[in-house]
């Protein structure tokens, strides 16, 4: 997500001029994605705008809380799949609102995405009723707002309009809570009750409905590769192209492979772009003190000459870092 968004808004090319916004640049980006010597398949430290690794699930809320501490004007919109919602760290993360002061800190807007399926299993939360989910989240100090996209998923325009309406409602609620709290001091503030947006959306929405008689959209088979095509198995490439062309790329990109101006204009500008946000790129705010690791390197001539513990030696370097 971070790679595709930053490429489309131009920031990826600003950071990597060897990947221009044209057909050749797009091909190169696709080539190096999840490829040896290329870029990671999930968010990684080198991914522009990334604040955590995307492959291991469970830390989204905790990292979002860290991003808004002492940043009172920031809202961290945090998308959580219902599969990630079942992990231990994520369940504990719902309590991160305990540590947020509505005067000094920003807010988290969890967007809990209920699609009903993990890679091979159904999920628990999607099988709960809205009433059960409301009781659960209210008990944890959140105010649930529901967006049932699944019920109107065949009408894409109506679905997007509904989700936009619920997002506006959530942001307005956050601003209302903060405005009331900021009439007083941080010392007087109590734990805020921020909204959680619970969105029921089909897994693999807008993907293939089925493949060879087996349902795809709305089930676990929508995960990752819905149509079996690779460099050595091209017999179904026409079906793949038909699906991808359903998104009408010819209306989004010009003949050179660049996003058309009327679409590009919608994107935020400057450091409002996802990959250029100073909060996610702390190293650009001020130089980082990385200390001199050479001072702590062990000097030896033959293997086994020195007996040492790695954590103790690294601890000396870490102490130098924070000195």
PLM feature segments, named:
Residues 1-102, 126:
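Cofactor-binding active-site loop characterized by glycine-rich and histidine/acidic residues
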Residues 1, 5, 84-87, 107-109, ...:
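Conserved acidic/glycine
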